[in-house]
């Protein structure tokens, strides 16, 4: 974003957790330099997306309350700081207009995921299709419906718990699935 901005002002749409993380602070210290970074925790946006309200008036209103002040302050580049936010990209494009660059870090995350899988020799061979299994700390049935709605794919969804910074499977089958996924 720092390399893309022409005005020297960048808006970051993220979650409170991201904005308060050490990783985010490290990235800001490393790359922001003289760039003015405007941050917003976008309270409620993840919940709206998870409710399937990606085109709803309420979602548009929230985005306008966040983005319009950033644009008024000179932001010409917006960064999507949450994996949920690409699902509301059409609304963002409409609100921000054609002269604002929107940076979606998902391709970089995908490349890093591929690198990690290659390093661990867990990348599926290109000669066969991979499979998709999603893990959620929420309701598995709801996650399956969201995956179908937002991604247009059917996939197996397993419920897990997040305890003491560790993923805990809820059943023996899920433990096996998760172990296969992480080993």
PLM regions and their residue ranges:
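Short, low-complexity, charge-dense intrinsically disordered segments
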Residues: 169-183
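Non-catalytic structural scaffold of enzyme domains
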Residues: 1-171
């Amino acid at each position: 974003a720092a390399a893309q901005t022409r005005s020297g002002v960048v808006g970051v749409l993220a979650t409170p957790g991201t904005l308060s993380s050490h990783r985010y602070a490290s990235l800001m210290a490393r790359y922001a330099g003289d760039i003015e970074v405007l941050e917003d925790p976008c309270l409620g946006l993840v919940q709206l997306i998870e409710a399937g309200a990606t085109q709803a008036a309420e979602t548009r209103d929230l985005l306008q309350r966040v983005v319009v002040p950033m644009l008024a302050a000179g932001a010409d580049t917006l960064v999507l700081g949450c994996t949920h936010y690409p699902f509301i990209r059409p609304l963002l494009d409409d609100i921000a207009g054609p002269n604002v660059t929107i940076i979606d870090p998902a391709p970089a995350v995908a490349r890093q995921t591929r690198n990690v899988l290659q390093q661990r020799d867990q990348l599926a061979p290109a000669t066969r299709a991979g499979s998709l299994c999603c893990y959620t700390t929420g309701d598995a049935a709801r996650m399956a419906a969201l995956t179908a709605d937002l991604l247009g794919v059917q996939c197996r969804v397993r419920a897990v718990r997040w305890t003491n910074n560790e993923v805990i499977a809820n059943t023996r089958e899920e433990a096996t699935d998760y172990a296969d996924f992480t080993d």
